[in-house]
Amino acid sequence: MENAANYTRRILKGGAKAHKSLGQNFLMDDRVIEAIAAASIKDPEIPVVEIGPGLGVLTRVLAQKAQKVWAVELDRGKVNLLQRELQGLPVDILNMDALKLDLKDIWGTGKGVLVGNLPYYITSPLLMHFLEQKDSLASMVVMVQKEVADRLVAKPGGKDYGILSIAAQVSAQGEKLFEVPPQAFWPAPKVTSAVVRFELRSYPGFRVKEKDFFRVVKAAFSQRRKTLGNSLAGGLGLPKQQIGEILAAAGVDEQRRAETLSIDEFQAVTEAVMKNLD
């Protein structure tokens, strides 16, 4: 197989361009590509969907390891290129916005693997979109900005811990696998990237409605520099005294800050909030 650097140069000489508006940075490092594919494909019979295939350098390798790959690409010009370059491989190319993709439309009630070098300008919306479809996924292996990767796997008490950390960890067990330097791409981004692998699962002992849970979490982080009592009062539109009673019932000090609470503590607060509102 033609190596990634030569493949990319050949296609770029043919007139293909990276569109900044779509956050396109093309991966050219074979070692990184192989590492992502190896982390993604544990069972060749499990279907794979790739988000943002770009020029297809990773898609080619995924298609050698998996029996079926769906590549989701918004850029119509890249779709035509992919159809030409990937001819003969077990790849279906979907010209659509990944934020509108329902995985059940691809593999029904089964589970598959999601892989992607996610466009940095819509990383969080994409992650949230697919985490909400956790029942359709066995795992995800995604490349994101290093700072986003750190947030995804952050633990309570650190500056990186926030809504995205909690959303990811409620739905999956995540691990940052390795970092990827800017020179692995063309054009080179201004930031270091990182690859994160998620094993999708239900959070052990999760006992509240996710809608209620995330309403409380978002309210708690709505004024990050303030105490939990003040943030929840403002975010939920409830009197400060009532919030104090709610937090006392949950066993949580109202002087703490949102970034110090574990998922289990947020569950306790959610339960207390909902009982108070009934």
UniProtKB/Swiss-Prot annotation:
EC number(s) per entry: 2.1.1.182
Please indicate if the UniProt record lists rRNA processing as a keyword: yes
Name the domain of life this protein comes from: Bacteria
Answer yes or no on keyword Cytoplasm. Answer: yes
Q: Which Pfam families match?
A: RrnaAD
Matches recorded under SMART domains: rADc
Listed binding positions for S-adenosyl-L-methionine are N25, L27, G52, E73, D97, N117
Enzyme class, UniProt record, top EC level: transferase
- Family of this protein: Belongs to the class I-like SAM-binding methyltransferase superfamily. rRNA adenine N(6)-methyltransferase family. RsmA subfamily.
Name of the protein? Ribosomal RNA small subunit methyltransferase A
Report which gene this protein is encoded by: rsmA
